[in-house]
From Swiss-Prot:
<comment type="similarity">
    <text>Belongs to the sterol desaturase family.</text>
</comment>
<dbReference type="GO" id="GO:0005506">
    <property type="term" value="F:iron ion binding"/>
</dbReference>
<dbReference type="GO" id="GO:0016491">
    <property type="term" value="F:oxidoreductase activity"/>
</dbReference>
<feature type="transmembrane region" description="Helical">
    <location>
        <begin position="325"/>
        <end position="345"/>
    </location>
</feature>
<dbReference type="InterPro" id="IPR006694">
    <property type="entry name" value="Fatty_acid_hydroxylase"/>
</dbReference>
<feature type="transmembrane region" description="Helical">
    <location>
        <begin position="178"/>
        <end position="198"/>
    </location>
</feature>
<dbReference type="Pfam" id="PF12076">
    <property type="entry name" value="CER1-like_C"/>
</dbReference>
<dbReference type="InterPro" id="IPR050307">
    <property type="entry name" value="Sterol_Desaturase_Related"/>
</dbReference>
<keyword id="KW-1133">Transmembrane helix</keyword>
<dbReference type="GO" id="GO:0071771">
    <property type="term" value="F:aldehyde oxygenase (deformylating) activity"/>
</dbReference>
<dbReference type="GO" id="GO:0008610">
    <property type="term" value="P:lipid biosynthetic process"/>
</dbReference>
<dbReference type="Pfam" id="PF04116">
    <property type="entry name" value="FA_hydroxylase"/>
</dbReference>
<keyword id="KW-0256">Endoplasmic reticulum</keyword>
<feature type="transmembrane region" description="Helical">
    <location>
        <begin position="94"/>
        <end position="114"/>
    </location>
</feature>
<feature type="transmembrane region" description="Helical">
    <location>
        <begin position="45"/>
        <end position="65"/>
    </location>
</feature>
<dbReference type="GO" id="GO:0005789">
    <property type="term" value="C:endoplasmic reticulum membrane"/>
</dbReference>
<feature type="transmembrane region" description="Helical">
    <location>
        <begin position="126"/>
        <end position="146"/>
    </location>
</feature>
Length: 619
């Protein structure tokens, strides 16, 4: 929102929220009526292109979003080395509004101008007219309109909304108040109306011109330099006809320079080109290699989780993951296809996120594998090969710590990472499974006045550490798994072993659990508090019970470039396993935490609090 919003700031369908696509219902109804009356042959090319062209524009923009986020996480060609936060993602959530607006106006134009219904697929002379009119009147008028928008009166009421994003993403290009978009549409309609008036309009000419506008808008706001220098060396005048991402980036950081739409020519002739444009272009193109201090290695969970990655769909990634959202299921076919392609061609981890905490740099890498694949016996070796490759790549790059997230540290897969430590005893990178901090977070979430807990966790080292710590506190630990009970009892000091009890009766209302099924949840007494020790949340089956979060903590304000949620966790909340790796790097601890090794619980907790991580309240 602008600092002092003026008239026509909001889109007309703003109050519809996610149901805004209903505004295209008249177009759908019109087409359906014609097909039912006269068959598919009754649809002319002009009408037939309205809805498909809107869909293609959305796909085009999404490709740019994913590409930009991927490159700014890993590339040395980043232009503005600052992060974006959730407020920018929320502000730019409605990037498709202008596509809907264009669709409605094109439909109105189709109804109002019968001549366009007979237009051919392509006219070369029409394309030439479009290019000339854009280069002249459109670029000229846009330049002066843009300069007017930077006058205090219009800037405070309209254009400041766009400039709230100093670090741009491709979709920043279309984040403007409704009134601005009306003017932009009028400007971009000039070449199209010119071809209609001259009688050389064509379907592909219109679609191609709009695709050009989208491409240049997205490229100019992508925040990484990709225009190669050799293009300008081969044809020097091109420097005045096509801008670069670094050229337009200066407009967002300096505000009073580089006003041109896509052609810097007008900034040159009116002396508004930023003097550092060439220097920034060259330095961004050259780039600087960067080595992260920490890598967190994760993976996809279920099919739709690919959309929840930071490089997926921005608005979905900015919220805690939920597979119950109806719109996620509409994307299922594409999710299934991406899973198959990842399974066949995914041969290494890929970078999905880049975070900074003061001077420490972190990256999140994801393996192209899903939860169900970790349960397949024949997939264990290939998955371990992927993890091993990621560890060796991190070691070669000089990364200090690599933390294993989700199932990448499963005991049955690689012994909590011990497999790699044994195989490569001279590793420089420290392998962390985060068990020490995860244990600490669980223990700190148990009420201090608790006298009894019910433990249903299996035999993981976190479960053992929790049982031992609770017995040391004098808390009675009740279990109903005989085999696990005897295994744990043998590891508890004799003077504390009496606090461990095997029983199925008088089960308390405080349950510490790993992964329990629906039947076990139904057995819990009313008012039970479930505290999970797993990285995966429990299914919230009971409304009369309380479900705590998986082990996690709130991150400090100093941690920057956080604009996506870690799986199902709330905003600016990070799993204990991820945080453990950060602490390892911050503190310079030299030990591995994998296999049976575990960091001191209190030491891990104290370090987390000291560095600004805060405990969570209940989920």
């Amino acid at each position: 929102m602008a600092t002092r919003p003026g008239p026509l700031t909001e889109w007309p369908w703003h109050r519809l929220g996610n149901f805004k696509y209903v505004v295209m219902a008249p177009v759908v109804a019109h087409g359906a009526r014609r097909v039912m009356r006269n068959g598919w042959g009754d649809l002319d090319i002009a009408f037939s292109l309205i809805l498909p062209s809107l869909l293609l524009r959305m796909i085009h923009n999404q490709i740019w979003i994913s590409l930009s986020r991927y490159q700014t996480a890993r590339s040395k060609h980043r232009i503005v080395d600052r992060g974006i936060e959730f407020d920018q993602v929320d502000r730019e959530r409605g990037w498709d509004d202008q596509i809907l607006f264009n669709g409605l106006v094109f439909y109105a134009g189709y109804l109002a101008m019968p001549s366009v219904r007979r237009m051919p697929v392509w006219r070369t002379d029409g394309a030439v007219v479009t290019a000339l009119v854009h280069t002249g009147p459109v670029e000229f008028l846009y330049y002066w309109f843009h300069r007017a928008l930077h006058h205090h009166f219009l800037y405070s009421r309209y254009h400041s909304h766009h400039h709230a994003s100093i670090v741009t993403e491709p979709i920043t290009s279309v984040i403007h108040p409704f009134a601005e978009h009306v003017v932009y549409f009028i400007l971009f309609a000039i070449p199209i109306l010119s071809t209609i008036y001259l009688g050389n309009v064509s379907a592909m000419g219109i679609v191609g011109y709009i695709a050009y506008i989208d491409f240049m808008n997205n490229m100019g706001h992508c925040n990484f330099e990709l225009v190669p220098e050799w293009i300008f060396q081969i044809f020097p005048p091109l420097k005045y006809l096509i801008y670069t991402p670094s050229f337009h980036s200066l407009h967002h950081t300096q505000f009073r320079t580089n006003y041109s739409l896509f052609m810097p020519f007008y900034d040159y002739i009116y002396n508004t080109m930023d003097k550092s444009s060439d220097e920034l272009y060259e330095s961004s193109l050259k780039g600087t290699e960067e080595t992260p201090d920490l890598v967190h290695l994760t993976h996809m969970t279920n099919l739709q989780s690919a959309y929840h990655l930071r490089i997926g769909i921005a608005s979905i990634a900015s919220k805690p993951y939920s597979d119950s959202a109806w719109y996620m299921w509409t994307l299922w076919p594409l999710a299934w296809l991406s899973m198959v392609l990842a399974w066949i061609y995914g041969s290494s981890a890929f970078v999905v996120e880049r975070i900074k905490l003061n001077k420490m740099k972190m990256q999140t890498w994801a393996l192209p594998r899903y939860n169900f694949q970790y349960g397949l016996t024949w997939e264990r070796e290939p998955i371990n090969d992927l993890i091993e490759k990621a560890i060796l790549d991190a070691d070669m790059k000089g990364v200090k710590v690599i933390s294993l997230g989700l199932l990448n540290q499963a005991k049955q897969l690689n012994g909590n990472g011990e497999l790699f430590r044994q195989k490569y005893p001279k590793l420089g990178v420290r392998i962390i499974d985060g068990s020490g901090l995860a244990t600490a977070v669980v223990l700190k979430s148990i009420p201090s006045d608790a006298k009894k807990v019910f433990l249903r966790t299996g035999t993981s080292k976190i479960a053992r550490a929790i049982a031992i710590a609770l017995c040391d506190r004098g808390v009675q630990v009740i279990m109903n798994e005989k085999e696990v009970y005897h295994m744990l009892k043998s590891q508890i000091p004799e003077n504390r072993a009496s606090y461990l009890k095997l029983s199925s009766d008088n089960v308390p209302q405080l349950w510490i659990v790993h992964n329990i099924d629906d039947n076990e949840q139904k057995m819990a007494p009313k008012g039970t508090i479930f505290i999970p020790i797993s990285q995966f949340p429990l299914k919230k089956l009971r409304k009369d019970c309380t479900y705590m979060s998986t082990p996690a903590m709130r991150i400090p304000e100093e941690m920057k470039n956080i604009h996506s949620c870690e799986n199902w966790l709330p905003r600016r909340v990070m799993s204990a396993w991820h945080i453990a790796g950060i602490l390892h790097a911050l503190e310079g601890w030299n030990m591995h935490e994998c296999g049976d090794e575990m960091m001191d619980i209190e030491k891990s907790w104290s370090a987390a609090i000291r560095h600004g991580f805060l405990p969570l309240t209940k989920a």
